[in-house]
Amino acid sequence: MQGQPTRKQLAALVDHTLLKSEATHADVAALVAEAVELGVYAVCVSPSMVPAAVEAGAGGLRVATVVGFPSGEHVSIVKAQEAVQAVASGATEIDMVIAVGAALAGDLDAVRSDIEMVRSAIAGVVLKVIVESAVLLGQANERTLAEVCHVAEAAGADFVKTSTGFHPAGGASVRAVTLMTEAVGGRLGVKASGGIRTAVDAIALLDAGATRLGLSSTREVLDGLS
């Protein structure tokens, strides 16, 4: 997207997110109410909160959740079972974290098989693959980030996603989104998440190629549109 979107256009690209471990059912209900008010695309909550989000949204709101979060170092079958349970609870999209250590070690076969196990477990459900782009760019290089995106595509992902937002290396960046967009060439969506707190941040990432935004400060970002 080039140029400044309208408030409605930007909201329609947002996964309104609450992944803090201390979040309560009341917090999730408030998140859902705000999501409906703001007109966002979906909410994204922790796996244990999927039923609460579905109930609060009366089944009329898309609910995304996370798998292997936030480290990505869960055994693949555990990620797959977590995804299956989330979908059974009403999740419509799954954001899984890759085996980041395997990616840094150059073991792309392990990265691919990990994604494929989750993909096969939830066929037909939107799957976003979190690559922790700040880690890959900081500890490896641009080629590694591109290769991981190619692996995600080959494994059947629908999106590549920059970050969990919980790693000290950082969240989304224009550089990462640009590289990821180039790597998938419009064949997959690109979700930017982590540290997006202003309208300026959001617009820059959309201009770089992001097609979805993960925001916890959604109202503040939308209110920042001039």
Curated annotation (Swiss-Prot):
Q: Where is the active site?
A: D95, K161, K191
> Record's family?
Belongs to the DeoC/FbaB aldolase family. DeoC type 1 subfamily.
What's the protein here called? Deoxyribose-phosphate aldolase
Q: Which domain of life is it from?
A: Bacteria
Per its UniProt record, what InterPro entries does this chain match?
Aldolase_TIM, DeoC, DeoC/FbaB/LacD_aldolase, DeoC_typeI
Q: What class of enzyme is it?
A: lyase
Taken from the UniProt entry, a GO cellular component term is:
cytoplasm
Q: Where in the cell is it found?
A: Cytoplasm
Protein keywords: Cytoplasm, Lyase, Schiff base
Catalytic activity reads: 2-deoxy-D-ribose 5-phosphate = D-glyceraldehyde 3-phosphate + acetaldehyde
Under Enzyme Commission nomenclature, its number is: 4.1.2.4
Q: What does this protein do?
A: Catalyzes a reversible aldol reaction between acetaldehyde and D-glyceraldehyde 3-phosphate to generate 2-deoxy-D-ribose 5-phosphate.
Database matches in Gene3D superfamilies: Aldolase class I
GO biological process terms held by the UniProt record = 2-deoxyribose 1-phosphate catabolic process; carbohydrate catabolic process; deoxyribonucleotide catabolic process
Transmembrane stretches in the record are: none
Give a GO molecular function annotation for the protein.
Answer: deoxyribose-phosphate aldolase activity
Q: What is its main location?
A: cytoplasm
Q: In which pathway does it act?
A: Carbohydrate degradation; 2-deoxy-D-ribose 1-phosphate degradation; D-glyceraldehyde 3-phosphate and acetaldehyde from 2-deoxy-alpha-D-ribose 1-phosphate: step 2/2
Q: Which organism is it from?
A: Mycobacterium leprae (strain TN)
Q: Which gene encodes it?
A: deoC
Is the keyword Transit peptide assigned to this protein?
no
